[in-house]
Swiss-Prot record:
Subunit text: F-type ATPases have 2 components, F(1) - the catalytic core - and F(0) - the membrane proton channel. F(1) has five subunits: alpha(3), beta(3), gamma(1), delta(1), epsilon(1). F(0) has three main subunits: a(1), b(2) and c(10-14). The alpha and beta chains form an alternating ring which encloses part of the gamma chain. F(1) is attached to F(0) by a central stalk formed by the gamma and epsilon chains, while a peripheral stalk is formed by the delta and b chains.
Membrane topology: Peripheral membrane protein
Species this chain originates from: Desulforapulum autotrophicum (strain ATCC 43914 / DSM 3382 / VKM B-1955 / HRM2) (Desulfobacterium autotrophicum)
Full protein name: ATP synthase subunit delta
Subcellular location: Cell inner membrane
């Protein structure tokens, strides 16, 4: 739980800087680049994060990596601050929170569309456009399949679930019939 609040705080701070200097998209890309770099080089990330190694040596390794990465001065300072506060291991969580803040700033919402069968791109686009009109924001849809739905679709937008599946409709009919029998 602590990592969540800490990551949110750092992501928010970077977002405020990005809003101020107009570089929110650049910082998003740079965060993504550094996470991809750490994913490709887990030993390096472990070395930088491991307190058993000398702190100055780890910092020098981080600075060398950042210098070769072509990152902005703000991003280098941000990552060095994360390191100095022993928070560099939270970089993925910071990146996730930053993504959500950047999307919120742009009026973009991520949603999941689950269907029993594969939907045509035309159908997906119509659903996306309808959702965007209803909530007044741009929608990025992740499309998934779940044959257990039998038919229809389920859409999840944050905490909101719009369930138009045959499975749920059959369940609701069964519950209604049960109540009708006992009445």
């Amino acid at each position: 739980m602590k990592s969540v609040s800490v990551s949110r705080r750092y992501a928010t701070a970077l977002m405020l800087i990005g809003k101020e200097d107009g570089n929110t998209d650049q910082y998003r890309k740079e965060l993504d680049d550094i996470v991809q770099f750490f994913d490709a080089n887990p030993e390096l990330e472990q070395t930088i994060s491991n307190p058993l190694y000398d702190k100055n040596d780890r910092k020098n390794v981080l600075i060398a990596v950042l210098d070769k990465g072509g990152l902005s001065k703000v991003m280098k300072s941000f990552l060095i601050l994360l390191f100095a506060k022993a928070r560099i291991s939270f970089i993925r969580e910071v990146c996730e929170f930053y993504y959500s803040l950047a999307d919120e700033l742009k009026g973009v919402v991520h949603a999941t569309l689950v269907s029993a069968t594969e939907l045509s791109s035309d159908a997906v686009e119509k659903i996306r456009a309808g959702l965007a009109t209803r909530i007044g924001k741009d929608i990025v849809l992740d499309v998934e399949q779940d044959p257990s739905l039998l038919g229809g679709v389920v859409t999840k937008i944050g905490d909101l679930v719009l369930d138009g599946s045959v499975k749920t409709q059959l369940f609701n009919m069964r519950e209604t019939l049960k109540r009708g029998e006992s009445a």
